[in-house]
Amino acid sequence: MKKILVKNQVEGGKVAFELLKESLTAGAQTLGLATGSSPIALYQEMVESDVDFSELYSVNLDEYVGLSPEHDQSYHAFMKAQLFDTKPFKESFLPDGMAEDLEKAAKDYDDVLAHHIIDLQILGIGSNGHIGFNEPGTPFDSQTHVVDLTDSTIEANSRFFASRGQVPTKAISMGIASIMAAKKIILFAYGDKKADAIFKMLKGPVTEEVPASVLQNHPDVTLILDQAAAAKL
């Protein structure tokens, strides 16, 4: 696992964009994308570049259950605002959090992933070690599934909503096995609230109680960290 220490998120975005361009040069067809604050600087680099993404596919990690794609806090809306409105892809896939049959929606998303093998997956990490919305205890062999969000995740996401009570309590997320199937992974971590999770991910045992620890078993992971996130290493 390669570690790159950066001064801030802006520098992290630039470093990640160079790695992304290397993947494109090597023939990448499908990008795995993430939401949250960590990848925004990368998306800004993509938007400001002259790189054409219109022949590429994208798949996103997750989506809240119960938020329409038009809701300003849905991950559909996030991706449109941060990237897709300016840099459209040939086709962009996100889980359907409004589906009447959520289990079928999860299975349908597995079918998408089977047809679009991820060449480069972007990840953040939760303070509890989650990747995607795969909370502690998620089986390592999990595929796309419906998730009950933990209190810590709901609390962390409440800053984006008018009140904690408006935060969705469920999501559809790519599973850990789905993430591990990506050929290459870039994980961002910024700030002291991520320091414990980064330490456990890298130095602790590989355990389902720290979902990100499974990345120790992946052949091609690059961590982009600031000093605060790397403080306990």
UniProtKB/Swiss-Prot annotation:
CDD domains (UniProt xref): GlcN6P_deaminase
SUPFAM superfamilies named among the record's database cross-references: NagB/RpiA/CoA transferase-like
Catalytic activity field: alpha-D-glucosamine 6-phosphate + H2O = beta-D-fructose 6-phosphate + NH4(+)
Intrachain disulfide bonds: none
Active-site annotation: 62 (proton acceptor), 128 (for ring-opening step), 130 (proton acceptor), 135 (for ring-opening step)
Highest taxon listed in the record's lineage: Bacteria
GO terms for cellular component: cytoplasm
Record keywords: Carbohydrate metabolism, Hydrolase
Top-level EC class as recorded in UniProt: hydrolase
Signal sequence region: none
Record keyword Iron-sulfur present: no
Gene3D superfamilies assigned to the protein according to its UniProt record, in alphabetical order: 3.40.50.1360
Pathway the protein contributes to: Amino-sugar metabolism; N-acetylneuraminate degradation; D-fructose 6-phosphate from N-acetylneuraminate: step 5/5
GO biological process terms, semicolon-separated: carbohydrate metabolic process; glucosamine catabolic process; N-acetylglucosamine catabolic process; N-acetylneuraminate catabolic process
PANTHER family, per database record: GLUCOSAMINE-6-PHOSPHATE ISOMERASE
Function: Catalyzes the reversible isomerization-deamination of glucosamine 6-phosphate (GlcN6P) to form fructose 6-phosphate (Fru6P) and ammonium ion.
Similarity comment: family membership: Belongs to the glucosamine/galactosamine-6-phosphate isomerase family. NagB subfamily.
Protein name according to UniProt: Glucosamine-6-phosphate deaminase
